[in-house]
């Protein structure tokens, strides 16, 4: 569970007991008495559907004039966290995270400047344009049956990228001189 005071809490016994996760490095903090508290709030938390130990977390600090993308991944159930913001826009807050239901390395993030995807688990991010204007993407949903990417924006409605499944083959395609994509009947 993520809270508006920047803390992440984890329960391993169906909510009977909760432990605070405090292993994020690189987040802005403030000193309150003897406590070193985060200035950020938790924007989004997403557990992987492929590996129960993998968790993604996005933090936001725009209320303090800081628009940096704070995006992290844990591969050990929250014991340690790796910054995966990599080459996302420097002042593009991250609002939402989605993981492909087939390829665990294909991730999508909604940012202040649109949606970005990665094929390598967050090492490299690519803007996904496809007619989408440069707008804040606040929510992302994946419609698994049709492989549609549904984007909720701030003030511009929602967009649907029909059948994004060719992105799963993109890494292989980029290595080839020529490639064919499987098409959907109908």
What residue spans do the PLM features occupy?
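Beta-propeller blade termini and top-face loops
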Residues: 1-186
């Amino acid at each position: 569970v993520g809270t508006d005071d920047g803390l992440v809490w984890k329960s391993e016994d169906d909510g009977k007991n909760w432990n605070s996760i405090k292993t994020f490095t690189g987040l802005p903090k403030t000193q309150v008495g003897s406590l070193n508290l985060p200035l950020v709030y938790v924007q989004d938390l997403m557990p992987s559907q492929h590996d129960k130990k993998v968790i993604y977390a996005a933090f936001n600090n725009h209320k303090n004039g800081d628009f940096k993308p704070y995006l992290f991944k844990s591969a050990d159930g929250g014991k340690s966290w790796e910054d995966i913001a990599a080459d996302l826009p420097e002042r593009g807050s991250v609002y939402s995270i989605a993981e492909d239901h087939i390829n665990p390395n294909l991730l999508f993030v909604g940012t202040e400047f649109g949606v970005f995807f990665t094929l390598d688990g967050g090492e490299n991010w690519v803007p996904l344009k496809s007619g989408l204007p440069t707008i804040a993407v606040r929510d992302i949903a994946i419609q698994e049956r049709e492989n549609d990417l549904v984007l909720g924006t701030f003030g511009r409605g929602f967009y649907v990228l029909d059948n994004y499944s060719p992105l799963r083959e993109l890494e292989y395609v980029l290595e080839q001189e020529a490639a064919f994509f499987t098409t959907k009947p109908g």
